[in-house]
Amino acid sequence: GMSLFFNGVIFASTLNYGAIVGIDTLGIPNATYAVVLMASSLAGAAASVILGWLSDRVRDRRLLVVACALTGAIGFGAIYLIRDQLSFILVTCAVMPFAFAIFSQIMAHARVHLTAAQPGRADFMISALRTVFAVAWAIVPPFVGILAASTSVFEIYAVAAAAFLVIAAIYLVMLWTDRAAWTAGKAGGARAAPVRPT
């Protein structure tokens, strides 16, 4: 649930400011910005296909969530730190399409997990998770608006990069916990195995 809330933080804090940063702050011409958005949309479609193909082949979908989260942290971190037209265009067109696929990856993992663990309540729980995502859209924009007005509009990218890192941390902890439990279970099974007489 927390991962979807922070996913909502990412979208709610940045999507409304793309044109402000690109056109008003960095001075990208309107026509160029339109091309950037078109290229980003096409790259997003390609990223969805690639990640969909990978999700059927990786051992654990959570690895893709971590990869998307770290990609997003690097991309938005670059915009925040470099603050020029080239970095904004490259990140928007080539990096963020893969990072923004994190929502579908989180939902796919949640559906698989909930269907296996609580098949009777899976649909309800998925709806609840979508509500958590929507809550961020309701409460985050005023705060990032105040932040952008009182400091710099680039600060919103620092917020989004931090949210990506939080998601990566959540899923890395989940992976580590499952790995530790599996290792402990394997060790316990080895200790409980009967000794064959010779």
Name each model-derived stretch.
Residues 1-41:
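Helix-loop boundary and gating motifs at the non-cytosolic
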Residues 41-49, 137-138:
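Residue-level signature of mid-helix packing/kink "hotspots" within the transmembrane helices
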Residues 96-131:
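Cytoplasmic helix-loop-helix junction between adjacent transmembrane helices
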Residues 57-69:
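Cytoplasmic membrane-interface "Motif A"-like loop-to-helix N-cap segments
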Residues 46-60, 148:
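Helix-to-loop junctions at the C-terminal end of transmembrane segments
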Residues 155-173:
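Symmetry-related core transmembrane helices of the 12-TM Major Facilitator Superfamily/SLC fold
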Residues 5, 86-103:
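Hydrophobic core of transmembrane alpha-helices in multi-pass small-molecule transporters
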Residues 70-84:
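C-terminal ends and interior cores of transmembrane alpha-helices
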